[in-house]
Structure formats: structure tokens, C-alpha cells
């Protein structure tokens, strides 16, 4: 089993250095690393060039691909990383985020998970007092995903999910990873495991943690959920038109209740954005 670590960066040199240190200090060296820089002007590109040369000179270089060029946003950058990654599992460790210790990759290999998504836990800005935990398997359902999410920075995702269901939606600015989890885990019923281990030290300087971004998050989530319900509606019709016609009144009631539930959730603060 091979792991691909994908790091996205844009004008965050100090955060990138923190991420790099935690990656190259991993005790288990059998992984590949893809770094996608969005054409930074703060010295990040020069730092990546120097890092790549030094790792090659020292005889161990996990960087299999890197680039520094303008992109169309964070999900466009992530999709670039997906295209060039060859591991069985992907982990997105973006600049500013870091592994909580040097044995994360080793422990992931030795646990021998086989689920489609393996979600570890995170600490926040170096503090376990601000820890966030992913749900246990029995707690992960549609209601959970409406009001919360799987934490992306500590989730190991099988490559085949992107190949089968598509990449991140680049039309969304903030919630495309949440949309991906919603569709593959709830609609497609892909397998999931909660790894009860702190994996990532999450930096709260990203766009999703900015309070000014919350209206965008709510708006994008509502649009995704509306599309999700409409797709479910169409899938019933396509699967069995006769049963669909018989159950249409019931479906209408269920849909109305779900919409009311969604509206209720979105009138309250969201967590784990």
C-alpha cells in the first residue's frame, strides 16, 4: 500500500516550512509527496526548489512532482495534485498543517485499514484542548453530514474514489471537500473507518475558519444539499417509475421534512467546517 501526501500552498512560506518539517521527519519513508504551489511570490517557489535539490542530494527524496504556477483556487490545486498522485491512499496536508508526530505514516501502514476513507482526528493550532474528532462509524449518517463534516486534513482517501466518482467540484470555493464526502459516504455508501488517533495539527488561518466566509459556506452547502435531494428524487424515478409514482406523495412529505431539517441546521452555527 502506497500513500500520497498532497500539499497545497500559496504565499504561505512559513506555513510551508512547518509542513515540510513534519513530512520529512516521518520515520516511515515509503510514501510519495506532491507539492502544488499556486505561483507564490513570497519565496515559496525558491524554497521548494532548494528543498527538492537537498533531498535528492541526501539520497532520499519523496517529492515525485511539484509545480509553481497560477491556479483557479484551492480545489483546482488539489485536483492537480490528484492527477499526479499514484498512491492507493491520498492525504491532503496543506501548508500550515503538520503531522502531530513523526510516526503517523508508520502507524497508518501498520494498522492495515482497508476502508475507502480512514479519518483520524486533529488538534488545532498545536493544542489538544482544541481537539476535533471525526465521528465513529455508527454516528456517520445524512444528519451528521448536514450539520457537520469529515475533517479533510486528517482523512486518508482511496484514489479509486476520485477515479470512480470524480474530483473536487471547482465551482465551489470552500465546501467541495464536504460535498465529496457527502456524496461518496452517504449517496454511494463507500466504506468508512474512524481512526482514534490524532493525525494532523490543523492551522486555523485557512479560508474556512474565517468568520467572514461563513455566509459563503452556508450558501454553498444549501445549494449542494438541494442538488443532493434532487438527484435522489431522479434516481428513484429512474430506478423504478411505477414505484416512484405510487410513492410520490410520501417522497414529497419526506423531502419537505428534510428541507425543514436543513433550514433548521443552517439557522444554527456549523461545526467542523
Label for each model-derived stretch:
Residues 1-4, 32, 179:
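Cell-envelope/extracellular polymer assembly enzymes that use nucleotide-activated donors
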Residues 90:
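Short aromatic/hydrophobic "clamp" motif used to bind/position activated sugar donors
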Residues 19, 68-85:
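Glycine-rich, basic loop-to-helix element that forms the pyrophosphate-binding segment
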Residues 1-25:
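N-proximal low-complexity "stem/linker" segments adjacent to membrane-targeting elements
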Residues 132-224:
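Conserved nucleotide-sugar donor-binding catalytic segment
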Residues 29, 37-48, 94, 98:
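A conserved acidic beta->alpha catalytic loop
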Residues 229-273:
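Membrane-proximal basic amphipathic "stem/tether" segments
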Residues 98, 102-131:
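Conserved donor NDP-sugar-binding/catalytic core segment of glycosyltransferases
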Amino acid at each position: 500500500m502506497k500513500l500520497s501526501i498532497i500539499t497545497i500552498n500559496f504565499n504561505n512560506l512559513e506555513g510551508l516550512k512547518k509542513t515540510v518539517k513534519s513530512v520529512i521527519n516521518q520515520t516511515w519513508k515509503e510514501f510519495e509527496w506532491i507539492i502544488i504551489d499556486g505561483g507564490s511570490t513570497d519565496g515559496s517557489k525558491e524554497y521548494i526548489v532548494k528543498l527538492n535539490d537537498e533531498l535528492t542530494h541526501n539520497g532520499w527524496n519523496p517529492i515525485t512532482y511539484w509545480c509553481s504556477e497560477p491556479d483557479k483556487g484551492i480545489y483546482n490545486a488539489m485536483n492537480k495534485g490528484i492527477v499526479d498522485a499514484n498512491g492507493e491512499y491520498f492525504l491532503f496536508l496543506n501548508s500550515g498543517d503538520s503531522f502531530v508526530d513523526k510516526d503517523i505514516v508508520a502507524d497508518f501502514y501498520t494498522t492495515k485499514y482497508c476502508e475507502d476513507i480512514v479519518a483520524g482526528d486533529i488538534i488545532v493550532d498545536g493544542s489538544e484542548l482544541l481537539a476535533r474528532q471525526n465521528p465513529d462509524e455508527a454516528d456517520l449518517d445524512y444528519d451528521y453530514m448536514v450539520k457537520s463534516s469529515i475533517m479533510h486534513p486528517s482523512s486518508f482517501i482511496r484514489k479509486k474514489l476520485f477515479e470512480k466518482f470524480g474530483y473536487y467540484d471547482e465551482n465551489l470555493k470552500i465546501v467541495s471537500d464536504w460535498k465529496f464526502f457527502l456524496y461518496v459516504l452517504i449517496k454511494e455508501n463507500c466504506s468508512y473507518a474512524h481512526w482514534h488517533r490524532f493525525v494532523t495539527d490543523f492551522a486555523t488561518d485557512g479560508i474556512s475558519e474565517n468568520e467572514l466566509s461563513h455566509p459563503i459556506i452556508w450558501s454553498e452547502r444549501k445549494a449542494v444539499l438541494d442538488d443532493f435531494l434532487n438527484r435522489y428524487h431522479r434516481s428513484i424515478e429512474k430506478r423504478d417509475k411505477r414505484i416512484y409514482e405510487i410513492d410520490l406523495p410520501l417522497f414529497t412529505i419526506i423531502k419537505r421534512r428534510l428541507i425543514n431539517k436543513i433550514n433548521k441546521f443552517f439557522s444554527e452555527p456549523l461545526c467542523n467546517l
